[in-house]
Amino acid sequence: MLVAAVQILTGGNLEENLELAVEKIREAAENGAQLIVLPEATSQAFGAGRLDEQAQGLDGSFATTIRAVAQQLGVTVVLGMFSPADTVERDGKTINRVSNTALIAGPVVLGGYDKIHTYDAFNYKESDTVRAGEALVAFDVAGITVGVATCYDIRFPEQFKELARQGAQVIVVPTSWADGPGKLEQWRLLTAARALDSTSYIVAAGQARPGGAEMAGQDSGPTGIGHSVVVAPDGTRVVEAGYEPEIIYAEIDSDLVAQTRKALPVLEA
């Protein structure tokens, strides 16, 4: 199975983001990809306005358009969007929270994974505006079981190990990874570690770096660092993007997953 990790840079306009996503999904499908992964916050970038104002359910125009395109092309798409969740009180204010949802859309599947681990770190508190999910999600594409995680989830190895124990051979990770000192090194280490922990392929699609490579390593990139990556179950980096928008491709070898798990039976521990 050929997978594509689509690295784009989205903004605050849902319709423009949808148009960009559809364009790149079509490009990846034309190049033979069966599973196409786009970043977290594809529908609306973080820091580009209130998330609840453009949040939609899986029956909204954003998700249904992606589903229609996926059906037309015969591919499965995973991408980040925001859906309405609940209302909470924070410091005397009423906040309409959203779910940070990874939409799963294809010919035979339409669902979503709600990010379990909200990004409450580095002086940021995502849980103020985003309700944490509770359930692990996996689905099948071309006879291969695919698990789903989102961005900050990658710091929690048990989620990846449990997905693998439930049958996942590939774990996709839509991401909007903030740039800053040491963040690229952390990203590379964590993606490789989760592949080794779960003896699964990791397919991580991130937002491109605002401002491109010239801004790399600075704290001014809160929405993306680029470097989308596919990591094999033995920790080998199969392909990695740079800072700019691009699409990367890799072939998933289920035999390699089986061989790695036989040689390195960490999931049995």
Where are these regions (language model features)?
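Active-site catalytic loop in hydrolytic enzyme cores
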Residues: 87-166, 179-189, 193, 259-266
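Short hydrophobic-aromatic micro-motifs
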Residues: 36, 145-150, 172, 202-203
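CN hydrolase (nitrilase-like) catalytic-core segments centered on the catalytic cysteine
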Residues: 59-78, 155-246
